[in-house]
Swiss-Prot record:
Transmembrane parts of this sequence: 32-52, 73-93, 111-131, 139-159, 170-190, 193-213, 234-254, 284-304, 316-336, 352-372, 383-403
Annotated GO biological process: regulation of pH
Lineage, broadest ranks: Bacteria, Bacillati, Actinomycetota, Actinomycetes, Frankiales
Any single Gene Ontology cellular-component annotation: plasma membrane
Gene Ontology molecular function, alphabetical: sodium:proton antiporter activity
Function statement: Na(+)/H(+) antiporter that extrudes sodium in exchange for external protons.
Keywords: Antiport, Cell membrane, Ion transport, Membrane, Sodium, Sodium transport, Transmembrane, Transmembrane helix, Transport
This protein's name: Na(+)/H(+) antiporter NhaA
Catalysed transformations (reactions): Na(+)(in) + 2 H(+)(out) = Na(+)(out) + 2 H(+)(in)
Family: Belongs to the NhaA Na(+)/H(+) (TC 2.A.33) antiporter family.
Composition-biased stretches (Basic and acidic residues): 423-435
InterPro entries: Na/H_antiporter_dom_sf, NhaA
């Protein structure tokens, strides 16, 4: 008797219809946020390179806040430490949901985006380190490891509107894991000093916040003061204050408890909070941070050349444009090789390359890590900002070229994905999903 052939599974398998709709809504909001992020960046660069650049710098250094709480911060610091805490709160909500009820709850499904994200962090970091061997810029190794999903989706909205849902889901999940790795790096690597008492004190409001949300309390007059107290104490401890946002996000339950009717009674509080806070994060917090962080004086082509001649800047550009796609491609290929996974019909490795290059758009978190590594406003931080902008622009242009070449194929695949012959509001491919999809990794 002949051997039964091994079952293969898809690298980018299609999810359920409700999950596909949820992801589509997230992508739509992030794409809008990406447009606002781009506008804020252009405005900051224009102002910083105008005859009125001194007023921009004065605004950045304007201080406000209570000195008794050590919160007399500049506007730029409030944007980085305060507003980005909202971004990381939403990231925490999304991470927990993915681990409890999303793609990352199944190790077999999670393997592709998790390993791809790890490759996309490790290779740029190694490449940066090699460029800066023996130099004084080794602290910036983590700068080119981040992916800015909002910017990436803004690019997709222009050149890849017909991208198949499996590829979109892969990009989003990869970015979620990327955020988790960035959070760990910021907390572990870029904590300069640690004060134990404030850190222990932060556990009290965090525990009260957790207790309330576990009981499905939504009253913001109760939750916001506890969140603010947690943020203040984490900030005072020396750990970057954005970590408080992640911890608060992790505290929110994903599934309803039995007292609230169980998971069958509807979405948990995490989805409710994510729906409320994502527009504020993508549409307000991140663009304002970009406005305060991206405004660097370039001084023409000579200034651009001088900035990019800095080995730190060169390492960032190479990490984003070369290291990021190389790491993602290598990890994804190895997963496919060792698990005998296949690409969906109509897809090729060129499509994976397009997404891997797109993931080289590292902006928000890259700028934040640059400030933590070299100090906000320092000459090297300015060089890094120019490098992040240059590398992200190059990655966007290269991804646009690759994905544009495949747009006709994507249009055909999207037509097949959206076909609804029985007119019941659910595309046929999602109704057939449970009958046609093999179990992954047997």
């Amino acid at each position: 008797m002949g051997q039964v052939p091994s079952r293969r599974f898809s690298l980018f398998d299609r999810r359920s219809w409700p999950e596909a709709r949820r992801i589509a809504e997230i992508l739509r909001r992030e794409a809008i946020g990406g447009g606002l992020l781009l506008a804020a960046t252009v405005l900051a660069l224009g102002w910083a390179n105008s005859p009125w650049s001194e007023s921009y710098q004065s605004m950045l250094s304007y201080q406000l806040g209570p000195s008794w709480a050590h919160l007399d911060l500049t506007l730029a610091q409030w944007a980085a430490d305060g507003l980005l805490a909202i971004f990381f709160f939403v990231a925490g909500l999304e991470l927990k949901r993915e681990f409890i009820a999303g793609d990352l709850r199944d190790p077999r499904r999670a393997a592709v985006p998790v390993l791809a994200a790890c490759g996309g962090v490790a290779v740029p970091a190694v490449l940066y380190a090699l460029v800066n061997v023996g130099g004084d810029a080794s602290a910036g190794w983590a700068i080119p490891t981040a992916t800015d999903i909002a910017f990436a989706l803004a690019v997709l909205a222009v050149i890849g509107r017909h991208l198949p849902s499996g590829l979109r889901t892969f990009l989003l999940t990869l970015a979620v894991v990327d955020d988790l790795l960035a959070i760990v790096i910021i907390a572990v690597v870029y904590t300069r000093h640690l004060s134990i008492l404030p850190l222990l004190g932060a556990l009290v409001p965090l525990a009260l916040f957790t207790l309330l949300v576990q009981r499905r309390v939504r009253s913001w007059w109760l939750l916001l003061p506890l969140a603010a107290a947690t943020w203040t104490l984490v900030h005072a401890s020396g750990v970057h204050a954005t970590v408080a946002g992640v911890l608060l996000g992790f505290a929110v339950p994903v599934l309803r408890g039995t007292r609230a009717g169980g998971p069958e009674a509807g979405p948990g509080l995490a989805e409710h909070f994510e729906h409320r806070w994502r527009p504020l994060s993508a549409g307000v917090a991140v663009p304002i941070f970009a406005f305060f962080s991206a405004g660097v004086t370039v001084d023409g082509l000579s200034g651009l050349s001088a900035a990019l001649s800095d080995r730190a800047a060169l390492g960032v550009v190479l990490g984003l444009v070369v290291g990021k796609p190389l790491g993602i491609m290598a990890a994804t290929f190895l997963v496919a090789r060792f698990t005998r996974a296949t690409l969906d019909d109509g897809l090729t490795w060129t499509d994976v390359l397009g997404l891997a290059v797109l993931a080289g758009i590292g902006f928000t978190v890259s700028l934040l890590i640059g400030e933590l590594a070299f100090g906000s406003g320092s000459a090297r931080d300015d060089h890094v900002k120019i490098a992040v902008l240059t590398g992200s622009l190059l990655a966007a242009l290269l991804a646009a070229v690759v994905l544009r070449l495949r747009n006709r194929v994507y249009r055909r695949l999207q037509e097949a994905e959206t076909a609804d012959r029985d007119h019941d509001g659910i595309p046929d491919v999602y109704q057939d999903l449970h009958r046609s999809s093999p179990r992954p990794w047997g």
